[in-house]
C-alpha cells in the first residue's frame, strides 16, 4: 500500500517522523480532513482536537493536537502544531489546572 512522508512538529519537539498510510486531522469546519498518499499539494488549518494516524504497518494511533497548520507538498506532510500528545501521555491534573487558569483569565477579562 502507498504511503507518504509525515513529520509532526510541536512547540517543544519533533513528535513523529516517518511513513504514514492515512491521517485524519481536525479542521475549522468542525469535521476532520482525511489525507491519503499523493494528496493534492495544499496548506490546511488544524484546530484543537483529535488526529488519527495509520502507520505503514497498518496500526492506528490517536493523538491530541493543538492548533496549527499542515502543509502537503510532493507526497510529504508536515504538521506544525502547538501540542501533540498520545492520550496516555496527558497529565490529567496539569490539564485541569491549565483549564481552570484559562477560565479565570476569561472571567477577569469579562468583568472589566
Per-segment meaning from a language model:
Residues 7-97, 101:
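Compact, glycine-rich, soluble single-domain proteins
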Residues 2-5:
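Short structural boundary motif marking the start of a folded domain
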Residues 102-112:
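Helix-termini ("caps") and immediately adjacent flexible loops/tails
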